[in-house]
Amino acid sequence: MSFKFEAEVRSAQGKGASRRLRHNGQVPAIIYGGNAEPVSIILDHDKVNNAQAHDAFYNEVLTIVVAGKEEQVKVQAIQRHPTKPKLVHLDFKRA
């Protein structure tokens, strides 16, 4: 099973900006590793939440399209809300 997500570059940083994203059904994330600079991105919460229900999400290489460029990544870390079934933040490492 392959996973492909559309993302946009995140310009606003910080707690307030992240809270606004989460309130609007989005989740902040970061892509790092390899020879490129880290990129802060925004993903659709529901699409990622549905995909993470599959075991393959954690083991396979995922494709994230950021500004028209495809990034091959693996999930490095996921932060979840302690009481709600919500994702708070994701870390991806370039494959």
Curated annotation (Swiss-Prot):
Q: Which UniProt keywords apply?
A: Ribonucleoprotein, Ribosomal protein, RNA-binding, rRNA-binding
CDD domains under this entry? Answer: Ribosomal_L25_TL5_CTC (cd00495)
Q: Which GO terms describe its molecular function?
A: 5S rRNA binding; structural constituent of ribosome
Q: Name one GO cellular component term.
A: cytosolic large ribosomal subunit
Give me any GO biological process, just one. Answer: translation
Q: Which Pfam families match?
A: Ribosomal_L25p
InterPro entries, per database record: Rbsml_bL25/Gln-tRNA_synth_N, Ribosomal_bL25/Gln-tRNA_synth, Ribosomal_bL25_short, Ribosomal_L25_dom, Ribosomal_uL5_bac-type
Q: Which domain of life is it from?
A: Bacteria
The record's function comment reads: This is one of the proteins that binds to the 5S RNA in the ribosome where it forms part of the central protuberance.
- Family the entry assigns: Belongs to the bacterial ribosomal protein bL25 family.
Subunit structure of this entry?
Part of the 50S ribosomal subunit; part of the 5S rRNA/L5/L18/L25 subcomplex. Contacts the 5S rRNA. Binds to the 5S rRNA independently of L5 and L18.
HAMAP family annotated for this entry? Ribosomal_bL25
* Protein's name in the database: Large ribosomal subunit protein bL25
Q: Which organism is it from?
A: Actinobacillus pleuropneumoniae serotype 3 (strain JL03)
Q: Mind giving the lineage of the organism this protein is from?
A: Bacteria, Pseudomonadati, Pseudomonadota, Gammaproteobacteria, Pasteurellales
**Name of the encoding gene:** rplY
